[in-house]
A protein has these predicted regions:
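Conserved core of the PLP fold type I
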Residues: 1-95, 112-113, 120-125
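Short acidic capping loops at alpha-helix termini that bridge into adjacent secondary structure
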Residues: 16-18, 131-134
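A short helix->loop->beta-strand "cap" motif at the edges of active sites that frequently abuts
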Residues: 38, 99-102, 131-132
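Hydrophobic "anchor" residues on beta-strands that sit immediately upstream
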Residues: 71, 103-104, 135
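Conserved Walker B
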Residues: 108-110
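PLP-dependent aminotransferase class I/II
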Residues: 133-217, 222-229
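Single conserved hydrophobic/aromatic residue that forms the stacking wall/gate
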Residues: 256-259, 263-266
Length: 266
């Protein structure tokens, strides 16, 4: 998947140009784009009165205009907050991207792992324009634990976008598939895989509920919201760190709370 991100960035931007991402963000994006010489501009997600993470549409529009950005990465479901964006939210985001003439990468690698009660809406499905300006990325790696096989795929309806991405991809051969990953993908997407994912989603919901309640009960000062998708919990430890006279740059071990990576890169 990151290979396609790099190829698309090479196809539609030049070194030194800016790309818009939401913050917090998947560190794989930032690493790849920085290595490609692109400037990263972040639009912070904000929490509403119920602690639900939301996009700041005004901030997105302002930063796209200020930095003359025409290439953006949209993560749906969102990594690492676990938000499963609603159709209206995606429509508003795509309207802003359209107004600023952006090519959009929609990372939908977590699309199979929505928790019960939530439904993934493909970005390309919300409008005709979204279908034509979006490069959608998918993979079985998160859902079926196949990341080590390095197999993903993209859906690009717009022929011009597709031709340019495929040309950029062909230069490095980084995106060439291998036989093992192809057959693993085929096997995962068979009916047996559907049944397994349905069972997995129930287990993840139970685990998320347990972890959420346990952390709130045992770690005063740690803030979190229940995820709607993915298998991650995004924690705000700022108050906890103040109470324990530490900071996010210091590895900590406190009863069962152990932090080997600070999360600052997100």
């Amino acid at each position: 998947m990151l290979g396609c991100v790099a190829s698309a960035a090479a196809a539609f931007t030049s070194p030194g140009e800016s790309i818009l991402l939401h913050s917090p963000t998947y560190i794989g994006f930032t690493g790849v784009l920085e290595n490609c010489g692109r400037n990263i501009v972040l639009s912070d997600l904000v929490q509403d009165e119920n602690g639900v993470w939301r996009m700041d549409y005004a901030d997105m529009d302002r930063k796209l205009k200020e930095h003359n950005i025409h290439f953006a990465i949209f993560c749906s479901p969102h990594n690492p907050t676990g938000r499963v964006w609603e159709r209206e939210e995606i429509e508003k985001a795509m309207e802003i991207y359209k107004a600023n003439e952006c090519v959009v990468i929609s990372d939908e690698i977590w699309s199979d792992l929505t928790l019960p009660g939530f439904k993934h809406i493909p970005t390309q499905s919300v409008s005709k324009d979204a279908r034509e300006r979006t490069i959608a990325l998918y993979a079985p790696s998160k859902t079926f634990n196949l990341a080590g096989l390095v197999g993903s795929y993209h859906i690009i309806y717009n022929r011009m976008l597709r031709d340019r991405v495929e040309k950029a991809s062909s230069l490095s051969h980084y995106n060439s598939p291998n036989v093992l990953s192809v057959h693993a993908l085929i096997g995962a997407y068979r009916p047996e895989g559907y049944q397994w994912v349905d069972e997995l989603r129930e287990v993840l919901k139970s685990n998320a509920d347990y972890a959420y309640n346990y952390i709130l009960e045992h770690f005063k000062g740690v803030k979190l919201s229940k995820p709607e998708g993915t298998y991650m919990l995004y924690l705000d430890c700022e108050e906890w760190c103040k109470e324990h006279d530490t900071d996010m740059d210091t590895p900590v071990s406190y009863t069962h709370l152990r932090a080997h990576e600070t999360g600052r890169n997100l």
